[in-house]
Amino acid sequence: MEEQILFLSGLGSHRLFLKELNNQLDNLNLVQIDLPGHGLNLDVIVNDLNELVEWFKTEMKIYDNEELTIVGHSLGADLLSYLCIKVPQIKNIILLDGGLFNLEDLDYSSEVEIKDTKNHLKNFQFKNLDEFIESEKDAYKTWNQNLLEASIARMTFNLNKQVYELNINEHSILKLLKIRRQINLPTFNQLIDRNILVLLPQEQDQFILDMKIKNIPSHIHCKTISDSGHDIYIDNPVKVGKEIKSWLSTINV
């Protein structure tokens, strides 16, 4: 029987983006939990940290009291860092370029982030899929049939505007961004009884990389993934999969 690893992805992602990484994990199976405002949880809205925790616990009911291994990427990693404090059932935590610092540390205010996100969603519209696909090809380090299918799956056609746009609930995701601001990252000091793996992309601003590394305690296993940017598990699924398998074997999962 395949062992399941749960996955909380970043803003605007889709479960199909996990396929390449999942193929590297042998007898392990990645199961995405769609964040509020995404996928199967498109109409879900959480208003504060308490509601976020209650939503997550509801998602976890299917797993009874079994110990969980969960991966978080980007926004998903930030939220996971807090959820792990409230859900002791989560024993093994894998953070993919997330959960390491507060955006205030970069003097990036919540107001500016909300404005930037709204502008991005407004501008991320395409008259046809060919135009969108060309944009996606430029956004990723590699391109294949799976990325094509995953990219198309995260879009929807707006009949009123006659454009393709991200299939997400804008109101819900803006709430999530505000909720993230209530979390004081990192949360490692509150998770000393958990197993934690941090994977960082090689290609990023050196100042930001140094800040992330500074926030990671020496007892936490941390690796830098070559040939990868922020979309670390999409850019280099082979190396990410190898590191996850190796780490899990050392903690006897």
Question: For each of these PLM feature ranges, what is it?
Answer:
Residues 2-42:
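Conserved HGGG/HGGXW glycine-rich cap/lid loop of the alpha/beta-hydrolase fold
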Residues 34-39, 99, 228-229:
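Short beta-to-alpha linker loops that shape the active-site pocket of alpha/beta-hydrolase fold enzymes
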Residues 72-76, 80:
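Gly/Ala-rich beta-loop-alpha elbow adjacent to hydrolase catalytic centers
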Residues 228-237:
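Catalytic histidine-centered segment of alpha/beta-hydrolase-like enzymes
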